[in-house]
Amino acid sequence: MSQFFYIHPENPQARLINQAVEILQKGGVIVYPTDSGYALGCMMGDKHAMDRIVAIRKLPEGHNFTLVCSDLSELSTYARVNNTAYRLIKNNTPGRYTFILTATKELPRRLMTSKRKTIGLRVPDNKIALDLLSALGEPILSCSLMLPNEEHTTQSDPEEIRDRLEHQVDLIIHGGYLGQEPTTVVDLTEESPVILREGSGSTAPFI
């Protein structure tokens, strides 16, 4: 059975943040809040935890995960960012966007797509998520918490999440009741941005 932490959305308790980081570092799978609903997360290099997330979501083989980063500097460690992309990302992070970028060699090979060496990255506008990332010291490997047969909305009610997933994850963080619309996905691998999915972030800056 999973642990269940009530963490204040504006003033996260450092003790609980540190306990959440310990769970991640021990191979745990967590549910945590972002600015676009709840997400499943684990350590970037933990294949077993990654496989557990695949099973929970019933994801197809080769599904693209996202690296949730603390800031633009950390994002730039794992992706090649040209001047145009840098400006667009800087002007729109933290925020409700996932950016598709060409991966650097710092990224574990299994996290890249097979046809194109790309990765999705984002910097969330959520205090709990940012405190987790700061305490962890590296990105969290994540995907939106969309359960099977409910692929168009992210889970927003942590009490309902506990009812459905308490035997499948190691920690659920209650950080408030959140929106249900996933991030807007923007491909920045070419000279001009391409909107791959319209979500909770405005597409106006990229058109």
Swiss-Prot record:
Disulfide bonds: none annotated. NCBIfam families: L-threonylcarbamoyladenylate synthase. InterPro entries: DHBP_synth_RibB-like_a/b_dom, Sua5-like_dom, SUA5_domain. Belongs to the SUA5 family. PANTHER family: DHBP SYNTHASE RIBB-LIKE ALPHA/BETA DOMAIN-CONTAINING PROTEIN (PTHR42828), THREONYLCARBAMOYL-AMP SYNTHASE (PTHR42828:SF3). It comes from the Bacteria. Residues 14-201 form the YrdC-like domain. It comes from Haemophilus influenzae (strain ATCC 51907 / DSM 11121 / KW20 / Rd). SUPFAM superfamilies: YrdC/RibB. GO terms for molecular function: double-stranded RNA binding. This is Uncharacterized protein HI_1198.
